[in-house]
C-alpha cells in the first residue's frame, strides 16, 4: 500500500464543524488510509463559519494539496472558492452535505438523506395515529434540508399529522435547546420532534426535560450516534434515529480520491444507505461506537 513514488500526495479536508463526533469519525477513516499510503492529510475546522471555511480552503491550496475533501458549512456561498480550486487543477470531493452547484466538484459522497427523513416519518406514522410535530432544522446545509423534506413529504398527504412549528439550530446541541424552548414558550403544543441530526436530538431532549414534557413528547434524530443509541435503550422520549455510517462515508471518500489520482473510472455520485435504529432493533447495534 505504501506510496513508492517520491512525491507524497497531499489531501486537504475541511468539515463544517469538528464539534460533532460524526465528522471526527469520517476524518479518522480517511486519515487511516492516507497514513497507510504514506501520504499527508491536513484537516481544518471552520467551526460553522463559512468565511473561515473559504479562508481555510485557500490556505490548503497554498500548501499544495492534490485533493480537497469538503463538507460545506453553506451549500452555495462556497461555490466561488471551489471554482478557484478547480482552476488550480485540484480534485474536489464533497462529503456528507452537497454543494448547490455539483458541476464544480468531481464527486459527491452522501448518505441517503432524503430517505433518512422518510424512514423517521414512516416509523412515527406506524407508532402514532396522529401527531403534532415540531421540526429542528439547519436550513443552510443541503443534507439537513433533504432530511427535513423527506419527513415533510411523507406526512404531507395525511391530515392526522400536522407540522406546528420549526426553528433553525445549525445542528448544534447547545442551539437546539433554546430553539425548542422558543416553540414551547410560544404556547405551541406538540408531541413529536423531528431533528435534523442527533446532536439536535440531544438538545431537544434537554429542552423537554427542562419543561417537564419528557413523558409526553417523542424525539427522532438522524445519525445513529453512540450517545443517542445509548439513550434509545434508556429513555422513553428518544424513539428512533436514522443511522448514517460515517465510517462508510470516510471509506468511500478516500477510495474515490485514490481512484481519481490513479486515473481510474469512478462514480460522480455515491449514495450510502441509511437504516432506522429503534428500541426494537437497538440490540443489533454497537452502542459504544459508530457504524
What is the role of each PLM region?
Residues 1, 154-155, 245-291:
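Hinge/cleft segment of the Venus flytrap/periplasmic-binding protein
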Residues 1-9, 83-90:
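Short, low-complexity disordered leader/linker segments with a strong preference
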Residues 10-29, 33, 37, 41-55, ...:
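Extracytoplasmic "Venus flytrap"
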Residues 53, 109-133, 145-146, 173-180, ...:
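Hydrophobic alpha-helical segments within soluble ligand-binding/sensing domains
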Residues 67-85, 151, 164-165, 170-230:
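Hydrophobic alpha-helical
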Residues 75-115, 126, 132, 225-234, ...:
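Flexible loop/hinge segments that line or gate small-molecule binding clefts
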